[in-house]
Curated annotation (Swiss-Prot):
Name listed for the protein in its UniProt record: Bifunctional protein HldE
Any GO MF annotation of the entry: heptose-1-phosphate adenylyltransferase activity
Gene Ontology BP term (one): ADP-L-glycero-beta-D-manno-heptose biosynthetic process
Location of the region described as Ribokinase in the Swiss-Prot/TrEMBL record: 1-317
GO CC term, one of those recorded: cytosol
GN (gene name): hldE
Annotated EC: 2.7.1.167, 2.7.7.70
HAMAP family: HldE (MF_01603)
Length: 473
């Protein structure tokens, strides 16, 4: 695992904890209510996502691991929405539906990427509710590589000691994302992952790294943990492992957009990596990378294997000549980083300044430029039997050498419509006096929310003119 990602498909993970439905209402606001000094939000969209232990399970599944989720929900509309969302994400659910109990729900109203208000819908769980999960928990433990306890303090995990004891009996590591000011009921777990605020609530202020390490090691020993991972926001993470020196990792976040669910991502990646055979240090390195990715997303979100791979090896998105299938993979990686994909096409038989300027202008419209190129047979059908002058291999090589071109891909049809419909670029560019309706693939791009931009060709530059000059001379 030291040279890349582990084989997550071999991991068998059990998640138990507070299952939450995260709801987002997106809208616009431009005025204050006449009824009270509050903004009026015109709702334009609604979105549901699994939260809490549900988000942990979704994160594990997104990496390709097998995951089972145990938790308590109500018998309401929110419960049905949660079951559907989790099943769609590949999570095997063993959720106990409780009558007359509201499914834990957090409703956030968002405008211009800013959270205006959060509304919580919840009822108190009693110990008997949590005990109802014990038979399913004992059964689900069999064959699992790790167990993750996701504690949001909502009542599902009122007696974590029983869960820890059952896990230890069968030799399954227990990972816990803790909650509250008393960590004593997590005694005997394998590792816990408090954030800095939670950690200091238990041990007191840590003004420097030395005090954090000393107090952390004391806590690790008191709780009989094999390891303690403290997440420290912009200061990264600190891993304290029995028999090893402290490991301090700087943050990998490029831009912090939303910290919602970051702790879920940390423990899910940590758990999946340990389940796949990684060491505590290796798993922490991956969890740190994943946290850096997820805080750059809005709301409760997950991190995919491709995103992790790209974060570990940022040069993995190579430029140049590519096949269609490779191109689609590269595009997915680029989009996971929020990059805008621009696409154009043509024969590019004899590359001239008009082509170069056109491609440079197209590249300025986004972050990545794809150039789709007609193969030799296609050019001959379009331009005549004496074309192309340069073979497909020659044309691809010259285009790929341009600084503004990221990927060059050939196609064999008369138009690139099929290829464009697979790529679905954010911006489709064409040169000349076309109308959008005349451009191959334009309808599919627009239907997907993309744009069509028509650029003007440079006067006095054309392949036909160059060929005529050569013939005359």
């Amino acid at each position: 695992m030291t040279h890349g990602l582990p084989h997550f498909t071999s991991a068998q993970v059990l998640v138990i904890g507070d299952v939450i439905l995260d709801r987002y209402w997106h809208g616009t606001t431009s005025r204050i209510s006449p009824e009270a000094p509050v903004p009026v939000v015109q709702v334009t969209g609604r979105e549901d996502r699994p939260g809490g232990a549900g988000n942990v399970a979704v994160n594990v599944a997104a990496l390709g691991a097998e995951v089972t989720l145990l938790g308590l929900i109500g018998a309401d509309e929110a419960a049905a929405a949660l079951r559907s969302l989790l099943a769609h994400r590949g999570v095997h659910c063993c959720l106990e539906g409780l009558p007359n109990i509201a499914t834990l729900t957090k409703l956030r109203v968002i405008s211009r990427h800013q959270q205006l208000i959060r509304l919580d819908f919840e009822d108190d769980f009693i110990p008997a509710h949590g005990e109802a999960l014990l038979p399913a928990y004992s059964t689900a433990l069999r064959g699992k590589s790790v167990v993750i306890l996701s504690d949001y303090g909502k009542g599902t995990l009122q007696e974590p000691q029983r869960l820890i004891a059952l896990g230890r009996e069968v030799g399954v590591p227990i990972l816990i994302d803790p909650k509250g000011a008393d960590f004593s009921h997590y005694h005997g777990a394998t590792i816990i992952t408090p954030n800095l605020a939670e950690f200091e609530m238990v041990v007191g202020p840590c003004p420097d790294e030395a005090s954090l390490v000393w107090k952390g090691e004391q806590l690790r020993q008191q709780l009989a943990l094999k390891a303690l991972l403290i997440t420290r926001g912009e200061q990264g993470m600190t891993l304290l492992e029995q028999g090893h020196s402290p490991v301090h990792l700087p943050t990998e976040a490029r831009e912090v957009f939303d910290v919602t669910g970051a702790g879920d991502t940390v423990i899910s990646v940590l758990g999946a990596a340990l389940a796949a055979g990684g060491t505590f240090k290796e798993a922490t390195l991956l969890a740190n990378q994943a946290a850096g990715i997820v805080v750059g997303k809005l709301g409760t979100a997950s991190v995919t294997r491709d995103e992790l791979q790209q974060a570990l090896h940022p040069r993995a998105i190579r430029r140049g000549i590519t096949s269609e299938e490779e191109l689609l993979h590269f595009i997915n990686l680029a989009r996971s980083r929020g990059e805008c994909i621009v696409m154009t096409n043509g024969c590019f038989d004899i590359l001239h300044p008009g082509h170069v300027n056109y491609l440079a202008e197209a590249r300025q419209l986004g972050d990545r430029l794809i150039v789709a190129v007609n193969d030799d047979a296609s050019v001959q059908r379009l331009k005549g039997k004496n074309r192309p002058i340069n073979s497909l291999a020659q044309r691809l090589t010259v285009l790929a050498a341009l600084h503004d071109v990221d990927w060059v891909v050939p196609f064999s049809e008369d138009t690139p419509a099929r290829l464009i419909e697979r790529v679905l670029p954010d911006i489709l560019v064409k040169g000349g006096d076309y109308t959008p309706e005349q451009i191959a693939g334009a309808n599919a791009v627009v239907a997907n929310g993309g744009k069509i931009i028509i650029l003007t060709y440079q006067q006095g530059c054309s392949t036909s003119q160059i060929i005529d000059i050569i013939r005359k001379n």
